[in-house]
Amino acid sequence: MARAERSVLLRLENISKEFPGVKALSNVHFDLRSGEVHAVCGENGAGKSTLMKIISGVYQPSEGTILHKGEKVQYASPLQSEAAGIAIIHQELNLVPHLSVAENIYLAREPRRGFLVDRKKLRLDAKRCLDRLGVDINPDQLVRSLSVAQCQMVEIAKALSLDAEVLIMDEPTSSLTEQETRLLFKVIRDLKASGVGIVYISHRLDEMAEIVDRVTILRDGRYISTDDFASITVDDIVTRMVGRSLEDKFPERTSRPTDDILFSVEGLTRNGVFSDVSFSLRRGEILGFAGLMGAGRTEVARAIFGADPLDAGKIVFNGRELSIGSPQDAIEEGIAYLSEDRKSDGLAIKMSVAANTTLANLGEVSNRFGLIDFKKHDDVAKRYVDLLNIRTPSIDQTVRLLSGGNQQKIIIGKWLFRQSRVLFFDEPTRGIDVGAKFAIYKIMDELAAQGIGVILISSELPEILGLTDRIAVFHQGRITGVLETAKTNQEEIMRYASGYGRAAQ
């Protein structure tokens, strides 16, 4: 379909949104045409999520106009926007694990025969939606048994079952492998060809060129620009997003590790998961864990932290062998783990900034009767908000309302207050923007400069190469090589990650 022939599905004019004490959006413009992918880019806190919530009826604008196919509308709820053909696929997928694929696709809209659900029609209708996507998923399969990529396809099928002509996708590739991303992009191209308009939110700017037609950039809640994607470079997008040029993606290291071994493991084994894993971590070192998905990096970190059992091996910290049977044991010894799933494992998402900051060390903010001393409690929270430059209206703000980068900083603050000396960062920049990434990188460098040992688990090789001193490469549950970062490159890391490098000494 030629660009000129595409009809405008959505137009937002002069959209503003105010919350108590905060202007989240100010005079924002946006439009979406049929059969196009229109990306919305901006740092965390730029207003992307607020804009999407206005489109989908979660919020109503304080000012401005929304036109849907030329008609002025204002949706009072997501149910109203869904009924009008607007569907959103959230980064945290919104499915019920113990129900089947078909039941999830038609949840609360099941076809009925009298008072009973028409199971045959439910299954056939769900299969028709899945077939349209070209994916092989059994409609009777329970959602809890699906991969993240398959769950995403179920969400898209659910949108198709609503006859959605506007589809909002929030960080759709953040948890996908490269192969799964290729499949998703094929589905997106097919949806474009059928006339669906897609709003695409992602921090992975490099992959947008494959599917995005236009890009709108927001900064600090304000509209910056809209361009054809082919006419703009990734560097241009980043500069407009952050308001300055980011010539250096990684901070210059301010220190180098000592020769002292702070932490080491020997022969760590968990049967069927990883085997004979040994490595050392020097004082003030950033050690990278690289490898393909499923190589065992996260599993090793979780076992060291006591979250999963070990069948064999030795953990030595400051020259002393540790016995770790639970996360509490690891925390007491000064070992911290920042999970790749920060919302489920790293934060009490419905609690405040202050409560999350002190959660791992409540004894330090309690009086002699074991009751929380709220002055101490709040003083600690304020100290780490200032130290880590956490952007929040107050320490009483609920953490689920903050951006991903600020949530990650709160978790770091929690472990610093606990005086942890070995920190595992598992995919610490997943789903956060380029500006926030740089801030997290700077914090990691500053921790290393204080003599803390940092282990970075990342699927982004430029990140591993830009931050670390050495890199332990995993393949099928084993370390196949430990490489000096200054002397290696992506190609060599991938050889070891694929099992073709020489064995680590």
UniProtKB/Swiss-Prot annotation:
One of its GO terms (molecular function) is ATP binding. Residues 10-245, 256-501 form the ABC transporter domain. Gene3D superfamilies: P-loop containing nucleotide triphosphate hydrolases. It is a peripheral membrane protein. It is found in: Cell inner membrane. It comes from the Bacteria. It holds the Pfam family ABC_tran. It catalyses: D-ribose(out) + ATP + H2O = D-ribose(in) + ADP + phosphate + H(+); D-galactose(out) + ATP + H2O = D-galactose(in) + ADP + phosphate + H(+). Its main location: membrane. It is an enzyme of class 7 (translocase). One of its GO terms (cellular component) is plasma membrane. Its EC number is 7.5.2.11, 7.5.2.7. PANTHER family: CARBOHYDRATE TRANSPORT ATP-BINDING PROTEIN MG119-RELATED, GALACTOFURANOSE TRANSPORTER ATP-BINDING PROTEIN YTFR. Part of an ABC transporter complex involved in carbohydrate import. Could be involved in ribose, galactose and/or methyl galactoside import. Responsible for energy coupling to the transport system. Belongs to the ABC transporter superfamily. Carbohydrate importer 2 (CUT2) (TC 3.A.1.2) family. This is Putative ribose/galactose/methyl galactoside import ATP-binding protein 1. It comes from Agrobacterium fabrum (strain C58 / ATCC 33970) (Agrobacterium tumefaciens (strain C58)).
